[in-house]
């Protein structure tokens, strides 16, 4: 196959995947700008993407582009070095700066990939992956001692940029990205034949401006995010509390509905019993059986529900201090159910006191 067997074909694949990745990086920097200018809209975008099928398809497609780009880059690098030493592209009259980036594209690519891994661990793994795996609330990442839900992207920005090393690593990654994109941007056009004396200078100029604007925005955003994280801006912003509250209300509703559904399923076999047709002994036996089933359910599922609600209440109180939890009907019902279950669990765990008979 031409795209695999020929050097030109492999360079063409590199060019096509490179174009797609440049467009993605441009989209990413614009989305980051939304987090600064309209943080509520940024959270809405994060929730929209989430673990929905279209987001998963896009993520897999993007991952495939990166893998193809990296594999072909390594392939071409080793092929070119075997044939022409360290020269990787036959290009006319390069500037010294471009010459350096051309000779070090592999090293720059490795730095960019390392930075990408850090970025994925800080964001994708804690957000979309958590949603995809349906991890329990108890294992959610913590910010200021409170759990953070996967869809609340602004809180993950604050969590990441609270770390003193984050802006340093990001800026190093952005500088490497500038060199890598600046050379890769125009060289991909050179690959498809746009390398004459008229177009090559224009493409180099476009590449430098485009890359410089994108990377400058990334660096500015990293600085702004760091300053905001140090001030706990996103976790304390009054305009975001309604959004955080809505997310916790949904969690409370889901937990309550799940508990209620399981409770109804457990008690379903006993709903249509006609105790009037039973003997006293049979009634006592059934009553004891129902009591045992209820106690087992409360001990197992009730404990799980209480633990979920403890996490929800902790997150809600930390992120929505100005909002009354009882303003949401399902949240209020869930909190009441939790309080009742806690009382029952405490009573069930308390051993009976030995009662001395009266003399």
Residue spans of the language-model regions?
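Membrane-embedded alpha-helical bundles that constitute the cytochrome b-like, heme-associated redox core
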Residues: 1-359
